From Swiss-Prot:
PROSITE patterns linked: PNP_MTAP_2
Important for substrate specificity, annotated site positions: S178, V233
Entry-annotated residues carrying N6-acetyllysine: K51
This protein's name: S-methyl-5'-thioadenosine phosphorylase
Family per similarity comment: Belongs to the PNP/MTAP phosphorylase family. MTAP subfamily.
Residues the entry annotates as binding substrate: M196, D220, Y221, D222
GO MF annotation list: 1,4-alpha-oligoglucan phosphorylase activity; S-methyl-5-thioadenosine phosphorylase activity
Length: 283
């Protein structure tokens, strides 16, 4: 991993999921309420620093957790972070494990997704906003930023965390949990973990030309595992409370590493990909 003097300034957006959105991780915090062409984001942006790296924290479900997954304004959230100058977005998300080896309390640095959502806008280029003209066909073969993932994986190893270096996330619409038949089906599809928020967040970040990576915290075994209690809200919150410090320490240690790494080529490539994926109207 290259380090040294950075020629490209970075700013890290942090989207905190259920139980993983503690603003105390930021030094010198200030709040900023913003609006976007797509409406208001989930909550105020919390601006601050982590070891001299500029960061912007946003609670995905609102600070009081009042927004269900289907109603999160993913477009506004990503747009607001982009407008604030974020080059990277690192998110935390609770998830269910679909694999024996991914135990509750483990971290997964996911590298792929399967989309089972049905109600969510997945593009800024929806034809109704002058700020995003045209139609965007963004490539998603590699949805998550490999370089950011590598920094997260290396840091997790140094911290001695139980961390899985890859995994496929299936995102369901929610807010209900899966039936047992669905849970079995997702396992046969090759999914490793399950949540309700990765899509469309990762897609919109790619359209915005942002380096996006996700820290997924396994809280349960969903409902496929025999002789194991099925997922419930109480169980998810209990596991998060016991293990949230792992995600916190990973963020606090990773972000200075990102701040000392050269990103100009990565960001240039992402910007070009986003730009050249848009088909503009013919005149």
């Amino acid at each position: 991993m290259a380090s040294g003097t950075t020629t490209t300034a970075v700013k890290i957006g942090i989207i905190g999921g259920t139980g993983l959105d503690d603003p105390e991780i930021l030094e010198g915090r200030t709040e900023k309420y913003v609006d976007t062409p797509f409406g208001k984001p989930s909550d105020a942006l919390i601006l601050g620093k982590i070891k001299n790296v500029d960061c912007v924290l946003l609670a995905r479900h609102g600070r009081q957790h009042t927004i269900m997954p289907s109603k999160v304004n993913y477009q506004a959230n990503i747009w607001a972070l982009k407008e604030e100058g974020c080059t990277h977005v690192i998110v935390t998300t609770a998830c269910g494990s679909l694999r024996e080896e991914i135990q509750p309390g483990d971290i997964v640095i996911i590298d792929q997704f399967i989309d089972r959502t049905t109600m969510r806008p997945q593009s800024f280029y929806d034809g109704s906003h002058s700020c995003a003209r045209g139609v965007c066909h963004i490539p998603m073969a590699e949805p998550f930023c490999p370089k950011t993932r590598e920094v997260l994986i290396e840091t997790a190893k140094k911290l001695g965390l139980r961390c899985h270096s890859k995994g496929t996330m299936v995102t369901i619409e929610g807010p209900r949990f899966s039936s047992r038949a669905e849970s079995f089906m997702f396992r046969t599809w090759g999914a490793d973990v399950i949540n309700m928020t990765t899509v469309p967040e990762v897609v919109l970040a790619k359209e915005a030309g942002i380096c996006y990576a996700s820290i997924a915290m396994a809280t349960d075994y969903d409902c496929w595992k025999e002789h194991e209690e099925a997922v419930s809200v109480d169980r998810v919150l209990k596991t998060l409370k016991e293990n949230a410090n792992k995600a916190k320490s990973l963020l606090l240690t990773t972000i200075p590493q990102i701040g000392s790494t050269e990103w100009s080529e990565t960001l240039h490539n992402l910007k070009n990909m986003a730009q050249f994926s848009v088909l503009l109207p013919r005149h």
